[in-house]
């Protein structure tokens, strides 16, 4: 499954009531670290898309989701499992560290 870009209007529908865990990647077009992290997010969406829904949300045009998830900086990650926020991370991280974080909550990583 590919990375799905969403907006404030789609946030609730795409993150709540899902059968799979949902990873939301918050980013900004002006953010250098976001550009560095993007390939890792795309790879995770490709490698685990059958078991993990991966969403991408640009922060500037979508302030409601940013406020709801208490995003204080970008890049940022939020992992939802069974409609609950179970993991948060702010700042760029390499793919191996990201997989480590996800492994704490997801048994298929």
Swiss-Prot record:
Cysteine pairs bridged by disulfides in the record: 31-34
The entry's keywords: Disulfide bond, Electron transport, Redox-active center, Transport
Cellular component, GO, one term: cytoplasm
Ranges of residues in domain Thioredoxin: 2-107
Matches recorded under SUPFAM superfamilies: Thioredoxin-like (SSF52833)
Membrane-spanning parts: none
Signal sequence region: none
Gene3D superfamilies per UniProt: Glutaredoxin
GO biological process: cell redox homeostasis
Pfam families: Thioredoxin
Keyword Disulfide bond: yes
GO molecular function, one term: protein-disulfide reductase activity
CDD domains noted in UniProt: TRX_family
Family affiliation: Belongs to the thioredoxin family.
Protein name, per record: Thioredoxin-like protein slr1139
């Amino acid at each position: 499954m590919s990375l799905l870009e969403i907006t404030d209007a789609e946030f609730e529908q795409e993150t709540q009531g899902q059968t799979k865990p949902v990873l939301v990647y918050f980013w900004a077009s002006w953010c250098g670290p976001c550009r560095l992290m993007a390939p890792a997010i795309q790879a995770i969406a490709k490698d685990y898309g059958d078991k993990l829904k991966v969403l991408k949300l640009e922060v500037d045009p979508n302030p409601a989701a940013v406020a709801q998830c208490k995003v204080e900086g970008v890049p940022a990650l939020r992992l939802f499992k069974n409609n609950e926020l179970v993991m948060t991370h702010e700042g760029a991280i390499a793919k191996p560290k990201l997989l480590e974080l996800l492994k704490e909550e997801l048994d298929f990583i």
